[in-house]
Amino acid sequence: MLKPIIHKFKYGKHNIILETGVIARQATASVLASMDDTTVLITIVSDNTTIPGQKFFPLVVNYQERTYAAGRIPGGFFRREGRPSENEILISRLIDRPIRPLFPKDFLYEVQIIATVISVNPQINPDIISIIGSSAALCLSGLPFLGPIGAARIGFLNNKYILNPSIEKIKKSSLDLVVSGTKNTIFMVEAEASILSEDNILNAILFGHESQQSLIDNIYLFSDKANKIPNIYKNIYKPDKQIFNLISKKIKKDINKAYYILKKKERLKKLNDIKQKVTSELLNNDSQLTSSKIEESIYFLERNIVRKRILKGKLRIDGRINNEVRKIDVRTGILPRVHGSALFTRGETQALVSATLGTSRDAQNLDDLLGDRTDNFLFHYNFPPYSVGEIGIVGSPKRREIGHGKLAKRSFLAVMPNIEDFPYTIRLVSEITESNGSSSMASVCGASLALMDAGVPIKSAIAGIAMGLIKENDSYIILSDILGDEDYLGDMDFKVSGSRLGITALQMDIKVSGITSDIIRSALYQAKSARLKILDIMENTLQIPRSDISKFAPRIYTIKINPEKIKDVIGKGGSIIRMLTEETGTVIEIKDDGIVKISAINGEKAKYAIKRIQEITEDIQIGKIYSGKVTRILDFGAFVSIGFGKEGLIHISQISNKRIDKVINHLKINQIIFVKVLEVDRQGRIRLSMKNI
């Protein structure tokens, strides 16, 4: 018999239901989590063996949406769900990020979390309940998870913070912030903002963490009610102090010297030489040792050396003080045929960013679970292996690249022009050509310059900075513009982007507990200081958007026609619009409300297309003289075309002031003549005359 264990509670204004014991019972743990009819099935399966030589925690999170959840059938030929969408990948990362740091560093068993959306309320985004359900399932799994964690989405509307706002409210909100953490510590923040102050952001984070306290209490109650599995992984490897001390004695001085080498490439070569030499020596002397044990001890040695140096107030790895930003080089317009381009170099991190302007036909059509939509602003981030001096597979973007592209895109949403004012689809591409930390924020800086170089009228320049943290007990140091090694050996990766007036996006990932509001506040204000310095340097090169778009970009013109005339412009089977596009070399798009967009690389061609459309759609004016072509000759007169789809009759009596016997003696087929409109009757028939012209 199926014996469900159900726990219901209120979370703000929402009803939460956590259930286990009925579905997916073969999994290590499973939870059916619901928030006001948005339901997600969370399953966790863990392996009971490790892969020899495994060096990292192989956690895989797969978030997947089923279209039946929204009462829909998938599009496409196969009519079934395919590879993960960008949104599914982003939410997978959102679930992963607060969970991963809560497993012991030496826990190396493979774990897979699958979150499947099986019912959706169109006003409730499934991401928050997916994090909640994953936290609850992990608490039942018997894995050494140091949770539970909570999750909250915070909006800011009418000067008030809103807990888990609906889809409708979040569209009106000036903030979309997700915060996740344990009872005492925040571990993850993701936010998009409409240029809000540091205090607004900090208060939102604290409000979100405070709000999820009752949620965490209820997950504890649920796990107690469900008789969670005891922790079955008792024999987890712990670092051997004897090995650590031996390695420390042999190479501590050499490692310390290596971390005074300022250039990354030289430093890494020296460190690798030291590591290979000591590893080879120890393995030859002791057959019981493994390379993974040696590597872990070396990691802790490196970590201790770098962290102690910084905490003592000494210079950082590359010789900077804590709040110093690396040397910046800015160049714009470096790609001659590209609509806008910039090369942004910060130390050993470099982004080559291009901006491309397209028409509405280039916009991306998105088939989301919460409804179809069109996106006319795209940001793609590429991280090739050569950027870190490695050989690797080049192919479709990885999760990290998609995540960094999304963060960079969110940095600009508050300053992009309205589609009505600037009717272009905009695509930004950031090629990371060198990387030593903070490449996503270099992409933001480069993108701001590329947009302005392309003549996109953004409201203000945007810059980004990545902050780090070194924390031991109550002592801590916040680092500006972190290197890759400082990210790897440190306790926080805190990316902040914005304008001079405020923050537009941020992403925070914390690896340790004990992060206080004072630490977050200090990081935010230190980031602001760095951001303003970077903006000063950027604005020395390009202060405002260029006054005109590139000569290689399409010119888009917009006109309004009577919606009843749309059929005249399109023609039977699209014949007229096809002829117009071929004749003028333009792209013509017509909306149901009569808005017509004409785009062409050559502005004169676009203007000619406008003239032709106006000729087609303008009403025939009585008494006006038109140039026309004779199309048919009959005994009683001739038909003359005076525009697309507009044909009038000249009666034989209106061809000449004198009496004539035969029309054919005065007019020929395809002859161009001038005619005056005498009348347009109720049926739209046009009567013409050649007299007195």
Swiss-Prot record:
Residues 623-691 form the S1 motif domain. Pfam families: KH_1, PNPase, RNase_PH, RNase_PH_C, S1. Its cofactor is Mg(2+). The keyword Cell membrane does not apply. Keywords: Cytoplasm, Magnesium, Metal-binding, Nucleotidyltransferase, RNA-binding, Transferase. It catalyses: RNA(n+1) + phosphate = RNA(n) + a ribonucleoside 5'-diphosphate. Component of the RNA degradosome, which is a multiprotein complex involved in RNA processing and mRNA degradation. HAMAP family: PNPase. This is Polyribonucleotide nucleotidyltransferase.
